[in-house]
């Protein structure tokens, strides 16, 4: 696994062995970032269930301003991969329960332009992640949440204020793009 393009292009990323981490494949990441296009540039990124950090580090390599990477078990791997890519200055690693970190980020008043969420497949956390991010108001008004799930899992078309706007399947993975809709009623 490697960074595909940008300032850290070609940098190999370390991956944990036997911890149940399922890194997003290079091909899937390449397609994802092609769809995101210029949205990545200067973005504030949050990577939930970060694992190896490949998604956030790819975004930073492509010009994102800052990224927060959250994972319960792979903190040392995240730090090593940020060091390898020379992106430590703009990568903030947080170790702990994803939902606890979502609450902490909300308490700090943080918002993000781009949120990646890649919970373990078939764990049933997809709706919970959307609900937690929505309740914490972490997504900026014009932001995008990208949810990776198993291809066989049910697609969540609406959850709270989130609506699915696009989905693509890549092998065993399905990438769902969700926007946050707010009511402008006076």
Q: What is the predicted function of each stretch?
A:
Residues 1-183:
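Class I S-adenosyl-L-methionine-dependent methyltransferase catalytic core
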């Amino acid at each position: 696994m490697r960074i595909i393009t940008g300032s850290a292009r070609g940098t190999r990323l370390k991956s944990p062995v036997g911890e149940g981490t399922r890194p997003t494949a290079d091909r899937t990441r390449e397609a994802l970032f092609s769809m995101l296009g210029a949205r990545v540039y200067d973005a504030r990124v949050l990577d939930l269930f970060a694992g190896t950090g490949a998604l956030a580090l790819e975004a930073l390599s492509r010009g994102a301003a800052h990224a927060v990477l959250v994972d319960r078990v792979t903190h040392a791997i995240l730090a090593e991969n940020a060091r390898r890519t020379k992106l430590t200055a703009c990568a903030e690693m947080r170790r702990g329960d994803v939902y606890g970190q979502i609450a902490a980020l909300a308490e700090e008043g943080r918002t993000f332009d781009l949120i990646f969420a890649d919970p373990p497949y078939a764990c049933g956390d997809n709706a919970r992640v959307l609900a937690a991010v929505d309740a914490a108001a972490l997504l900026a008004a014009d932001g995008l949440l990208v949810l990776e799930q198993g291809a066989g899992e049910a697609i969540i078309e609406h959850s709270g204020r989130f609506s699915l706007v696009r989905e693509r399947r890549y092998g065993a993975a399905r990438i769902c793009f969700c926007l946050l809709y707010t009511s402008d009623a006076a």
